[in-house]
Amino acid sequence: MLRITALSSLSQAVTLRLEGQIVGRWVEELKRSCEELRANGDGMVLDLVNVSFIDTTGLALLSELRHGKVSLVNASPFITELLKGAGLW
């Protein structure tokens, strides 16, 4: 399961707090949420503080998002190592 919470921000960027695992069908849910919120052209921050695992499809999506205006923040040491291994951190 993946919980996605949009947080209000004083900056132009929208922050999404993610909780759970970025795997399987939840990858498409995250992609849909990002596309909807990025429609206005502002940047986006993905807060990974409560993400416990990311599979290969999740890493592929994060790689795709990083080519846009998306920043990844607050990853745990385990998630940081996964992201480093994929060249995303």
Give residue spans per PLM region.
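Short beta-strand/loop segment at the start of cytosolic alpha/beta domains
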Residues: 1-17
